[in-house]
Structures are given as structure tokens and as C-alpha cells.
């Protein structure tokens, strides 16, 4: 059999932390972008996280009840928002980074903190200092770049609204 050529845009998101035994842990999430895929579970494109740790990261799509380690979503665009979930059981910082990026040469990846409105270009690792807890509605990844006509300045001028459902605040 011949080798298949996968030209789908995709990237691997890395997550580093130190566990309670003082061991460095690295989790990796994968995602690819293909026309016709959705945020619903699609066999062959999505895979659940079966070994969720006390401190961990996962794709957190509202349409799917389980947490994903691998996801296939629709086409890459400036409108696409990929929700991230974090489970934090440490007082130590955690680090998020792009481990690998394929067929996305004209795209930058940004982490958005919907609570603070901050936007971070993920071309360098991002250290997060989060209190213990679960974060499922706070962080998303968005995409920009020359192919989309979106630059850093445009992204910085976007307005994000965060709704805190527990405290009924915006």
C-alpha cells in the first residue's frame, strides 16, 4: 500500500505541568480542519480522553458530553473558535504551547481568555497561573494571519463578552 498524503491543516497543542510527585507531565491534543466536519462527535475524526488527570487540558465542545484529546472540525477560518477545557489541581503554573503545526503556514493561533479579554499569540508558549478548579467556558483558540486578512492589531481590537453563569454577571 502506498503512503497517503494528508494535506489537512492540523496542529498539536501541548500542555506541561508538574504533578504532586514533582514529575513533569506533557499532554498533547490534536486537531484537524476539514470541510464538512462539525463540533459534533464524528467517528474517525474525534477521540475521547480516557485518562483525564487531576490537572489536564481537553477540547471542550458543548455538542459533545465527553472531553476530547483528538478532534476534527470544519474548515479553518477567522470565525472558527475552538473551546478549551482545563482541569487544574495544582497551585503551580501550567504551560500551553503549539507542539506541531502542519499545512497552516499562513495562520497564527491565538489563545483568548474570555474572562479578562486578553489575547495571546501562541507562537511562543503561554504560562497560565490558574486557581484550582475546572475551566470550561473561559478559554478558546482563534486563528488569524495574512491568508485571513486578520492581523494582531485587528484581534486586539475585538470585544469579547464573558458570562459568569454562577454569579449571573457579564
Predicted regions and their residues:
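Compositionally biased Ser/Thr/Gly- and acidic/asparagine-rich
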Residues: 1-170
